[in-house]
């Protein structure tokens, strides 16, 4: 009975979503059919409105074109001049360490026949996926330098990346703003690439010193343990020799000693040894 009820529940769970999907398709088909066959009066009204709009646009021809021209002019103000050539050289290298000074030189060459006035040099870090979003904007360097035709000028700029930016990529944008003798402003993107801020390894800190001390202690303990093991093995392998004196006269050459002395020595060794007290008492009794 329990198995039969579970089968019915499974069938219901499968059939219910299928019914909803089929019902949704039917309703969608009905709505699409209504969209395919609209009322003819609605089409006629839309056509009349479109004709009126076209007539109004023909009557006012210069309203939108003037705005477009102004926008194009505004965009044209920030473009570079064809007679201006720029170069960049990073003095501190292509790496950008965090919380360290980054210096670079910008070269400006006037290849035209009119003077150029270089106004400012600016740099900024931007979001890599969207260069319109500023992450860190540095102070613009005012220059106000006039570069004559067929002349060159170089400018130095430096900035310091923030410490929290270390280890992450950012878009570095370096812009040079200048104008010609007629007063038209121009802007050249000297550098516009994604760079990674590098985190420099600092000197010895507390953790590093503690690690070195710990490793030194381990090495000393290991050397001391090896020394103890080797010393114990050498003691077992080479027993200590104890020096003993001669136990007899076998290895001694006594041929040079007189015979009388040898007889006395043999008698002394054969007779029992008496203590000093007995000797003194015997000597005293003899004298009495």
From Swiss-Prot:
Segments for region (Disordered): 34-69, 267-288
Cytoplasmic side: 230-288
Membrane-topology descriptor: Single-pass type I membrane protein
Glycosylation sites: 137, 192
GO cellular component term, pick one: endoplasmic reticulum membrane
Statement: the UniProt record of this protein carries the keyword Cell division: no
InterPro entries xref list: TRAP_alpha
Assembly behavior: Heterotetramer of TRAP-alpha, TRAP-beta, TRAP-delta and TRAP-gamma.
Further facts: Seems to bind calcium.
PANTHER family named among the record's database cross-references: TRANSLOCON-ASSOCIATED PROTEIN SUBUNIT ALPHA, TRANSLOCON-ASSOCIATED PROTEIN, ALPHA SUBUNIT
Domain comment as written in the entry: Shows a remarkable charge distribution with the N-terminus being highly negatively charged, and the cytoplasmic C-terminus positively charged.
Function of the protein: TRAP proteins are part of a complex whose function is to bind calcium to the ER membrane and thereby regulate the retention of ER resident proteins. May be involved in the recycling of the translocation apparatus after completion of the translocation process or may function as a membrane-bound chaperone facilitating folding of translocated proteins.
Protein name from the UniProt record: Translocon-associated protein subunit alpha
Lineage, top ranks: Eukaryota, Metazoa, Chordata, Craniata, Vertebrata
């Amino acid at each position: 009975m329990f198995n039969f009820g579970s089968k019915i529940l499974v069938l219901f769970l499968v059939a219910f979503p299928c019914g909803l999907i089929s019902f949704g398709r039917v309703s969608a088909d009905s709505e699409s059919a209504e969209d395919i066959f609209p009322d003819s009066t609605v089409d006629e009204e839309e056509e009349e409105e479109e004709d009126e709009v076209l007539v109004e646009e023909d009557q006012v021809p210069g309203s939108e074109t003037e705005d477009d021209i102004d926008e194009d002019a505004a965009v044209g103000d920030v473009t570079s001049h064809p007679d201006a050539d720029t170069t960049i050289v990073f003095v501190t290298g292509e790496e950008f360490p965090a919380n360290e000074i980054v210096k670079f030189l910008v070269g400006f060459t006037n290849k035209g026949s009119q003077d150029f006035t270089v106004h400012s040099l600016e740099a900024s870090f931007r979001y890599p996926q969207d260069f319109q979003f500023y992450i860190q904007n540095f102070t613009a360097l005012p220059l106000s330098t006039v570069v004559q035709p067929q002349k060159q000028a170089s400018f130095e700029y430096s900035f310091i990346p923030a410490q929290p930016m270390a280890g992450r990529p950012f878009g570095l944008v370096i812009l040079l703003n200048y104008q010609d003798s007629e007063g038209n402003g121009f802007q050249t993107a000297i550098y516009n690439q994604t760079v990674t801020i590098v985190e420099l390894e600092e000197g010895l800190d507390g953790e590093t010193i503690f690690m070195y001390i710990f490793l030194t202690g381990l090495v000393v303990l290991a050397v001391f343990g090896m020394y103890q093991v080797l010393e114990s093995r050498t003691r077992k392998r080479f027993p200590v020799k104890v020096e003993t004196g001669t136990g007899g006269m076998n290895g001694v050459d006594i041929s040079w000693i007189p015979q009388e002395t040898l007889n006395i020595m043999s008698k002394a060794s054969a007779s029992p040894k008496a203590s000093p007290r007995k000797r003194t008492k015997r000597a005293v009794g003899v004298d009495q």
